[in-house]
Regions:
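Short N-terminal targeting/anchoring amphipathic segment
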Residues: 100-120, 132-135
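Short, well-ordered alpha-helical microsegments
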Residues: 47-49, 117-123
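A conserved catalytic-core segment of Leloir-type glycosyltransferases
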Residues: 41-106
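Helix N-cap/beta->alpha junction signal
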Residues: 116, 138-140, 182
Length: 182
């Protein structure tokens, strides 16, 4: 019996036409050659039939969670106001949580993998109940990106970017100690 992997991505990995999509697509192909992969992705644009077909060809189970519009920015601001990162709020999704919980209750995963720090919580308890290993692929270190924005911006955005960068750095450090691979 093949291992079973849950892969949660912050964007649809097809078509592989830019950095993060190229990376997540290559990881997905690699995993699919070795395991049965259940893929759930946030979709910030409509998913075409061609995209669906390409991803169905390499997954056991597939779900797209619509994730566009101004409400995500409100969630990001509220998250930041509550002491978390804006990134975590931007990627918050009740539907994503529900799918992960449902799939996890019906399958025993050998591993669970998330494609960014902003969605890392979705591959850890209490959302995933049965993952042997938890992996997080930061793709790029978002905390450094925000700290770089801080140094090239003026007040008040420099303050916001700096706060996000520091909070994300703390989150990334915590994840490094909480998960099996990063």
């Amino acid at each position: 019996m093949k291992p079973r992997v849950l892969y949660v991505t912050h964007r649809v990995p097809w078509p592989p036409d830019r950095g993060d999509r190229i990376r997540t697509w290559n990881i997905l192909k690699f995993l699919a050659q070795r395991a049965d992969v259940d893929l759930v992705c946030l979709a910030d644009e409509p998913v075409s039939a061609k995209t669906r077909k390409a991803l169905e060809g390499v997954t056991r189970r597939l779900a797209f969670v619509p994730h566009a519009g101004p409400r995500r920015y409100v969630r990001g601001a509220l998250s930041m106001a509550c002491g978390r990162t804006a990134t975590e709020g931007l990627f918050e999704s009740r539907q994503l949580r529900s799918i992960v919980k449902l799939w996890s209750s019906n399958a025993e995963y050998t591993a669970a993998l998330a494609s960014s720090s902003g969605i890392a919580r979705f591959v850890q308890p209490p959302y995933v109940k049965t993952a042997g290993r938890v992996w997080i692929d930061l793709i790029d270190v978002d905390s450094q990106k925000w700290l770089d924005y801080q140094s090239s911006s003026r007040f008040p955005m420099s303050t916001v970017y700096g706060l996000e960068g520091r909070r994300l750095r703390n989150l990334e450090s915590k994840l490094a100690s909480d998960v099996d691979r990063m």
